[in-house]
Swiss-Prot record:
Organism for this UniProt entry: Latilactobacillus sakei subsp. sakei (strain 23K) (Lactobacillus sakei subsp. sakei)
Location(s), subcellular: Cytoplasm
Example GO molecular function: translation release factor activity, codon specific
GO cellular component assignments: cytoplasm
Name this protein carries in UniProt: Peptide chain release factor 1
Gene that produces this protein: prfA
Family: Belongs to the prokaryotic/mitochondrial release factor family.
Origin: domain of life: Bacteria
Major subcellular location class: cytoplasm
Length: 365
């Protein structure tokens, strides 16, 4: 029997076992265990349903093929052939859907994120582009019914951002935005360019899953907290008190400074949220590096020094270099219509993973 069918049969058995356990009065009375089993059962429900239907379809295909061999009636033959064609189409679709459902899932996919955008090469133009990217992601988040909150920002005099951090919360945020990690290049004529020459600038985007308290433990002894007087805009109140906070995670050397809020406590809360996300991301990146040594993914490496996309304003063109995707609708993409780009990246990643899954295993057919 095909190895994949063996795995599916195992899932079917486990699903039946879970349903039996969840009907046990002792389990029902043990809330935490019942919730754990319920979550596992819900996670298997879709693939079990599709596999159950696939088995029915395979059985119907066998019956129709036998009927086709035995019948001598021409009208019946045509009816059976038509049924077989429909069944084969459904079979192929179910097999593909099941293969995708069997792909290893990213445990972070359902998490909220902290996104950091930084102006990189290109001076003022890079900071302006960082602001444009921020606006693009905010509009996309709005289209997905996600919530956004700016939690840290360093603005520039020209109206852009040296760096800006945003929390995005909602359903499956990380699963869609994790591919945005990397360097984004813009080619356009700056407003200050009198000769009409196209300039090239870059901004980097970091997407980090929100720390939920169980992913990695931050011990108090590993965190150094320094407080100091805030500088810059904010008024006399800020400058008279030590409201700014700098947190250092000693084992990794990661530093977060926060002075945007009016009170030290507010700055502490936001600094800790960013620090937790960065430390978690640091350890995740180390694990990913080990994983990538055995499997390279064109879209999932998350290397922030890698140029992933070019935005060419004169030609209204956006190109994602990882998958060779070019779309001539930059104006709409910058207005938050990222769906086509993100869907293409997800499909490409799934296709890569399917090839990995099928290496050494037979097809379902």
């Amino acid at each position: 029997m095909d190895k994949m069918f063996e795995q599916l049969d195992g899932l079917l058995d486990r699903y039946a076992e879970l349903q039996e356990l969840m009907s046990d009065p002792e389990v029902i009375n043990e809330t935490s265990r019942y919730m754990e089993l319920s979550k596992e059962e819900a996670g298997l429900r879709e693939i079990v349903g599709k596999y159950t239907r696939l088995k029915e379809v395979l059985s119907e295909v066998t019956e129709n093929e036998e009927l086709l061999r035995e019948t001598t009636d021409s009208e019946m033959t045509e009816l059976v052939k038509a049924d077989l064609e429909e069944l084969q189409t459904e079979k192929a679709q179910l097999e593909q859907e099941i293969k995708i459902l069997m792909l290893p899932t990213d445990p972070n996919d359902e998490k909220n994120i902290i996104m950091e955008i930084r102006g990189a090469a290109g001076g003022d133009e890079a900071s302006l582009f960082a602001g444009d990217l921020l606006n693009m992601y905010q509009r996309y988040a709005e289209s997905q019914n996600w919530q956004t909150e700016i939690i840290d920002e360093t603005a520039t005099e020209v109206g852009g951002f040296k760096e800006v951090a945003m929390m995005i919360t909602g359903k499956n945020v990380y699963s869609k935005l994790k591919y945005e990690n990397g360097a984004h290049r813009v080619q356009r004529i700056p407003k200050t360019e009198s000769q009409g020459r196209v300039h090239t600038s870059t901004a980097t985007v970091a997407v980090m899953p929100e720390y939920d308290g169980v992913d990695v433990e931050l011990e108090a002894k590993d965190i150094r907290v320094d407080v100091y007087r805030a500088s810059g805009a904010g008024g006399q109140h800020i400058n008279k008190t030590s409201s700014a906070v700098r947190m250092t995670h000693i084992p990794t050397g990661i530093v977060v400074a926060m002075q945007d809020q009016r009170s030290q406590q507010q700055n502490r809360v936001k600094a800790m949220k960013i620090l937790q996300a960065r430390v978690y991301d640091y350890y995740e990146s180390q694990n990913q590096s080990e994983y990538d040594s055995s499997r390279k993914s064109a879209v999932g490496s998350g290397d922030r020094s890698e140029r992933i996309r070019t935005y060419n304003y004169p030609q209204n063109r956006v190109t994602d270099h990882r998958i060779g995707l070019t779309l001539n609708k930059l104006d709409r993409i910058m207005n938050g219509e990222l769906g086509d780009v993100i869907d293409a990246l997800i499909l490409f990643d799934q296709t890569e993973k399917l090839e990995q899954l099928q290496d050494g295993t037979a097809h379902l057919s």
